[in-house]
Amino acid sequence: MSQQLQQIIDTAWENRAELSPKAAPADVREAVAHALEQLDKGALRVAEKIDGNWTVHQWLKKAVLLSFRLEDNAPMPAGGYSQFYDKVPSKFANYTAEDFAAGGFRVVPPAIARRGSFIAKNVVLMPSYTNIGAYVDEGTMVDTWATVGSCAQIGKNVHLSGGVGIGGVLEPLQANPVIIEDNCFIGARSEVVEGVIVEENSVISMGVYLGQSTKIYDRETGEVSYGRIPAGSVVVAGNLPSKDGSHSLYCAVIVKKVDAKTRAKVGLNELLRGD
C-alpha cells in the first residue's frame, strides 16, 4: 500500500503546478489524505532510524506540501474568542474525551497541534505549537512557547524547554527535517534548524543556535564540525576567533561528553557548569 501511495504522490509532485483545490485527480486527493492520516496516527513518519541510520521518506514530505495545493482556506472556530482561517485543521478539532484518553497525552490550553502531526503517549504539550508532519515520541515535554516545526522528529523522553524553536522543512523548503534523538534536553530559547541532528542523551544549554552553517567546536579534540551533535554531548554557546584575531564569530561548543548513566545521575546544572 505504501509503495502505491508513494508512486501516486511522486508523480503528482512532478505535476504539482497543475494542481489546485478545484483541479486535482481523485486518486491524488485520496493518496495525500491517506498519507496525512497515517502521519497523524504515527503509522508513517517522515524520517525513521533504520539499522542505526536516519532515513528520510521524501515522498511523505511531498504529500504534506501537496496538501497545501489541494485545500482551500476555510474559517476555523477557536472556542468563541476568535477564528482562524487556514488550510490545515487542528489535530484535536474533533477529539472526544475517549480520544484524548486513548491518546494518553496532555494538551494544556492553548497548545496547538496541526492535523498530520503525531503525539505519542505521555507527551505533555504546554502552550506550544506542533506543525504538520512532526513526530513527538513518548514521554516528551514540549514546554511553553516552544515550537516543533513541520516534519521535525522528536525522540522519547526529550525536554524542549520554554521558547525552544525546532525548525521545519516547509518554509523555507529544506531537504531533511530536524531530528532530536531520545533523552535529549534542549535549553530555553535555543534554536535547532536546517536538518541538524542532535544525537541521543545530549544536553543543549540555554540560548544555543544550531544550523547547517554553525560551527560546532569540540573543546576536547579541537575539531570543528557541522550539522550534527554527537551522542552524549554537553553543548554551550561560544565564539571562535578569526585567523587574524580581528573578530570572533558565534559557534556551539561541546564542553564534554557523558554516557547515559552519568546523564541520569548528574543534575543538568552540574553538567553545564563544566570545568
From Swiss-Prot:
UniProt keywords (A-Z) are: Acyltransferase, Amino-acid biosynthesis, Cytoplasm, Diaminopimelate biosynthesis, Lysine biosynthesis, Repeat, Transferase
Q: State the source organism's domain of life.
A: Bacteria
Q: Which GO terms describe its biological process?
A: diaminopimelate biosynthetic process; lysine biosynthetic process via diaminopimelate
What phylogenetic lineage does the species belong to?
Answer: Bacteria, Pseudomonadati, Pseudomonadota, Betaproteobacteria, Burkholderiales
**Reaction catalysed by this chain?**
(S)-2,3,4,5-tetrahydrodipicolinate + succinyl-CoA + H2O = (S)-2-succinylamino-6-oxoheptanedioate + CoA
Organism expressing this protein natively: Burkholderia ambifaria (strain ATCC BAA-244 / DSM 16087 / CCUG 44356 / LMG 19182 / AMMD)
Family membership noted in the UniProt record: Belongs to the transferase hexapeptide repeat family.
Main subcellular location: cytoplasm
What's one GO MF term for it? 2,3,4,5-tetrahydropyridine-2,6-dicarboxylate N-succinyltransferase activity
Which Pfam families does this UniProt record tie to the protein? Hexapep_2, THDPS_N_2
Extract the Gene3D superfamilies matched here: Hexapeptide repeat proteins (2.160.10.10), Tetrahydrodipicolinate-N-succinyltransferase, N-terminal domain (1.10.166.10)
Record-listed E.C. numbers: 2.3.1.117
Q: Name the gene.
A: dapD
NCBIfam families per the record? dapD, PRK11830.1
Q: What name does this protein carry?
A: 2,3,4,5-tetrahydropyridine-2,6-dicarboxylate N-succinyltransferase
Q: Where in the cell is it found?
A: Cytoplasm
Can you state the subunit structure given in the record? Answer: Homotrimer.
Which GO terms of the cellular component aspect does the record hold?
cytoplasm
Top-level EC class? transferase
